[in-house]
Amino acid sequence: MLDIKQLVKTYDNGHQAVKGVDLSIHQGEFIVLVGPSGCGKSSILRSIAGLESITSGEIHLAGRRVDNEKPANRDIAMVFQNYALYPHMSVYDNLAYGLKNRGVDKQTIAAKIAKVAKTLKIEEYLDRKPAKLSGGQRQRVAMGRAIVRDPQLFLFDEPLSNLDAALRAHMRLEIKKLQRELGVTSVYVTHDQVEAMTLADRIVVVKQGEIEQVGTPAEVYHQPASTFVASFIGSPAMNFLPASIKQGQLHIAGKHCYLPQFDAMSSENITLGIRPEHASLHPLTNAIELKLDIQVVEPLGPNQLVHGKIIGLESEQDFIAVTAEIPLDVHQTLPIWVALEQLHLFDQQGKRFVQSHRSCTQSSKVASTRQQ
């Protein structure tokens, strides 16, 4: 439906914001571009919209090349962070403005606006000016203006950034329901990984102008392609610990387990990734046990964040575990177990070691520790 081929965007100051991006988006898909500020995600979006000229590459929409066409001719509608509503116009006139410019007759405009207003539940606001609306109401009007055009493609440029946390959560749900109902292909830009995980059919993680990983929310969460993706997707961020592997034996904090899939691999410097929510306080089978020296406990209500250091590591690497809300003391030693299937291994360049299945047996030293 939308095909981006070797997209490059270099600005006049020489900064290359987008570096040869290739991306294919299917009809009706909801794609979220996510990454830190300055990673190039907004440049990709603005290039699709035609708000930025591209340096090289091609953009095809429904089989038609559009990168050499004016924005108005691309059949794309965009929703901005700042709503981009005309303050002197009523909500109705804001919704009708684009249709009037295209020469659509008044009766058709009225019918389209009535349908969109009902869908977005903004019927009672049609006579109001934007200044009389809340942030969430303005964002719904901005979405309505895009929907009423009946475009082939929706583009969302961080549309929820100006809203408070509660309203963001509500609007996320509204956008997802609306996109499912309309079935319009959508590309959404955000720096918020929660928005990415909850909204996307597929997530595109962008780093320094290049695509780091494309996958479903589950794929990006459970099989991050790199330490960058692993640290960006998931909250709290993944823990990273120094480890080594020798002929399949994984060594970490004085303990080791055998990974038969890696029996031909040896490296003195690898990174072991553990998600905070995968640290169990109860012994698990086919798991590795580590001990945490507690530094800080942050109560969150139903659970808590336990910050500390892994005992046995030479480095002073911080470690966070998400646990049930139980009484814990600073400098208490807390045993934690992590299922081997939930360990993530990365090489010295931060790239993921890929394997289809893990089956580890622990050494007697680890086993004896677990029995204490």
Swiss-Prot record:
Q: Which CDD domains match?
A: ABC_MalK_N (cd03301)
The family database entries (SUPFAM superfamilies) matched by this protein are listed as: MOP-like (SSF50331), P-loop containing nucleoside triphosphate hydrolases (SSF52540)
List residues of the ABC transporter domain. Answer: 2-233
E.C. number: 7.6.2.10
Q: What is this protein called?
A: sn-glycerol-3-phosphate import ATP-binding protein UgpC
Q: What class of enzyme is it?
A: translocase
Q: Report the InterPro entries cross-referenced here.
A: AAA+_ATPase (IPR003593), ABC_transporter-like_ATP-bd (IPR003439), ABC_transporter-like_CS (IPR017871), ABC_transpr_MalK-like (IPR015855), ABC_transpr_MalK/UgpC-like (IPR047641), Mo/tungstate-bd_C_term_dom (IPR008995), NA-bd_OB-fold (IPR012340), OB_MalK-like (IPR040582)
The disulfide bonds in this chain are: none
* Residues engaged in binding ATP: 35-42
The alphabetical list of record keywords is: ATP-binding, Cell inner membrane, Cell membrane, Membrane, Nucleotide-binding, Sugar transport, Translocase, Transport
Q: Which family does it belong to?
A: Belongs to the ABC transporter superfamily. sn-glycerol-3-phosphate importer (TC 3.A.1.1.3) family.
Could you describe the subunit structure of this protein?
Answer: The complex is composed of two ATP-binding proteins (UgpC), two transmembrane proteins (UgpA and UgpE) and a solute-binding protein (UgpB).
> Which species is this record about?
Vibrio cholerae serotype O1 (strain ATCC 39315 / El Tor Inaba N16961)
Name the job this protein performs: Part of the ABC transporter complex UgpBAEC involved in sn-glycerol-3-phosphate (G3P) import. Responsible for energy coupling to the transport system.
Q: How does it sit in the membrane?
A: Peripheral membrane protein
Query: What is its subcellular localisation?
Result: Cell inner membrane
A single GO cellular-component term from the record reads: ATP-binding cassette (ABC) transporter complex, substrate-binding subunit-containing
**What catalytic activity is recorded?**
sn-glycerol 3-phosphate(out) + ATP + H2O = sn-glycerol 3-phosphate(in) + ADP + phosphate + H(+)
Which residue ranges run through the membrane?
none
User: What GO biological process terms are annotated to this protein in UniProt?
Assistant: carbohydrate transport; glycerol-3-phosphate transmembrane transport; glycerophosphodiester transmembrane transport
Q: State one molecular function term (GO).
A: ATP hydrolysis activity
